[in-house]
């Protein structure tokens, strides 16, 4: 299904609105949602970490988990993500976020062009 006149994709797999932090790639149904995510993820990370710290003080880096939660809140038309160039389910992305909690830094997000199939296969090798 192509994008509508207002630039909305109902099938996230076809969307050209893409954000990536090199490991994880999120697809958005509209440019509005993409911009909302890119403009707000750093602030959401701070809020998310404050919520966690109220319950327990933890040495782990919760940024990726916060980013996944924020993506789920912003994108209202589904969930579509790639993990290192391959399709990933909601659960697989969460497991990845739990694995990288021990890393001190989380990469920042940026808008990218939707990778073509050939480029995607190169990144998987």
Swiss-Prot record:
Does the entry feature the keyword DNA-binding, yes or no? yes
The record gives the effect of mutating residue 119 to Q as:
No effect on transcription activation from the A3 promoter and on transcription repression from the A2c promoter. No effect on the interaction with host RNAP
Entry's Gene Ontology BP terms:
regulation of DNA-templated transcription
| Documented effect of changing residue 120 to Q | 80% loss of transcription activation from the A3 promoter and 80% loss of transcription repression from the A2c promoter. Complete loss of interaction with host RNAP
A Pfam family in this protein? Answer: Phi-29_GP4
> Sorted alphabetically, which keywords does the UniProt record give?
Activator, DNA-binding, Early protein, Repressor, Sigma factor, Transcription, Transcription regulation
Q: Name one GO molecular function term.
A: DNA-directed RNA polymerase activity
Q: Which InterPro entries match?
A: Phi-29-like_sf, Phi-29_GP4
DNA-binding region as annotated in the record: 77-96
List residue numbers at the site (Interaction with host RNA polymerase and activation of the phi29 late A3 promoter).
120
The record describes its quaternary structure and partners as: Interacts with host RNA polymerase (via C-terminus). Interacts with DNA; binds to the A2b, A2c and A3 promoters. Interacts (via C-terminus) with the histone-like protein p6.
Family membership:
Belongs to the phi29likevirus late genes activator p4 family.
Chain's role: Mediates, together with protein p6, the early to late transcriptional switch by stabilizing the binding of host RNA polymerase (RNAP) to the late A3 promoter. Activates transcription from the late A3 promoter and represses the main early promoters A2b and A2c by modifying the topology of the sequences encompassing early promoters A2c and A2b and late promoter A3 in a hairpin. Proteins p6 and p4 bind cooperatively to an approximately 200 bp DNA region located between the late A3 and the early A2c promoters.
* Protein name, per record: Late genes activator p4
């Amino acid at each position: 299904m192509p994008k509508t006149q207002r630039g909305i994709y109902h099938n996230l797999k076809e969307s050209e609105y893409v954000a990536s932090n090199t490991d994880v790639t999120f697809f958005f149904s509209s440019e509005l949602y993409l911009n909302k995510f890119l403009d707000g993820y750093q602030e959401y990370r701070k809020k998310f970490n404050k919520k966690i710290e109220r319950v327990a003080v933890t040495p782990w880096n919760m940024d990726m988990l916060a980013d996944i939660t924020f993506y789920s809140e912003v994108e209202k038309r589904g969930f579509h993500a790639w993990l290192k160039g391959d399709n990933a389910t909601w659960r697989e992305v969460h497991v990845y976020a739990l694995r990288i909690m021990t890393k001190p830094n989380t990469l920042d997000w940026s808008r990218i062009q939707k990778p073509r199939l050939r480029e995607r296969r190169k990144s998987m090798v």
